[in-house]
Structure formats: structure tokens, C-alpha cells
Design a protein with these regions (language model features):
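Short amphipathic alpha-helical segments
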Residues: 8-10, 18, 28-39
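Short, charge-rich, low-complexity interaction segments located
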Residues: 34, 43-50
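Short glycine-/aliphatic-rich beta-strand segments at the starts of folded cytosolic domains
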Residues: 51-62, 97-99
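Non-DNA-binding regulatory cores of transcription-related proteins
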Residues: 69-127, 131-132
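Solvent-exposed residues in well-ordered beta-strands and their adjoining turns
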Residues: 11, 62, 103-105
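Short Lys/Arg-rich basic patches
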Residues: 1-9, 22
Length: 132
């Protein structure tokens, strides 16, 4: 994919906000920051549709909570067509972190994440999506 140069006219306040964004996120230049913002916008537009996206559901939970491991596995098996892989990490004697790599329609991934995150015993979790 080739690079196309173009000029942009902005109000001073907007330019200052862009420069603050560049600095805060350690972009090497404004072009990289604008590219990142456009990519983020494009990805978010895909979330609002039935487009295919990829992502990860990351959860932290107490594995001593009665039957939580089985409940998580059951939800995953019910949606196996969306799950590419999982990684289970023991953070402490009681607490586990699980990363579930997913791919499918954005609304299906959101529904899957909601089912997992609503299980009793999940301390925290988040769905992160990007374009597939």
C-alpha cells in the first residue's frame, strides 16, 4: 500500500490537542498519530456492524469459587466456533487470569464476552476487538 501525502487545516486549539495526543502517546510524528486515530475509527465502525473482527476476552477470577472453571469452559464450548485459543495463568493461589483469543462477528463476540463476564466469580474482564 502506497503512502499519499495531503494537507490538513486545523484551528490552533485542535492542533494543540493533536500535539498533546502525539506527546502523550509517544508517536514519532503527527502523521503516525493521525493514522492511528483513523485506524481506531475504522475498527470501531466494524464493531457497530456484523463485520468479522478479531480480539481477546481477558478475565480475572477466583478459581476457588464453586464450579467457576466448569462454567467458563461450558460457555467456551457452547461458542467454540468463535474461540481460536485460550491461555490460563495462575496469578496467585486463588486468582487466575484467562485470555481467550476470539474471531467472529462483532456482535457475536460481544455476546460471548457478556456471557463470560456475567458469571458469578469473575472479578474483572474486558473484550478487546480489532479488525480481522
Amino acid at each position: 500500500m502506497g503512502v499519499v501525502r495531503f494537507g490538513v487545516s486545523l484551528e490552533k486549539e485542535t492542533m494543540d490537542e493533536l500535539d498533546n495526543y502525539v506527546t502523550a502517546n509517544k508517536f514519532p510524528n503527527r502523521s503516525q498519530a493521525i493514522r492511528n486515530l483513523i485506524e481506531k475509527y475504522a475498527v470501531e465502525q466494524k464493531w457497530n456492524c456484523d463485520n468479522e473482527v478479531a480480539g481477546a476476552i481477558v478475565i480475572v477470577y477466583d478459581h476457588h469459587k464453586r464450579n467457576i472453571d466448569n462454567e467458563i469452559n461450558e460457555v467456551q464450548h457452547d461458542h467454540h466456533e468463535l474461540i481460536l485459543s485460550t491461555q490460563h495463568v495462575h496469578l496467585s493461589h486463588e486468582t487466575c487470569l484467562e485470555s481467550i483469543v476470539v474471531k467472529g462477528k462483532a456482535n457475536e463476540l460481544t455476546e460471548l464476552a457478556d456471557k463470560i463476564l456475567s458469571l458469578k466469580g469473575i472479578h474483572h474482564g474486558k473484550l478487546i476487538m480489532t479488525r480481522a
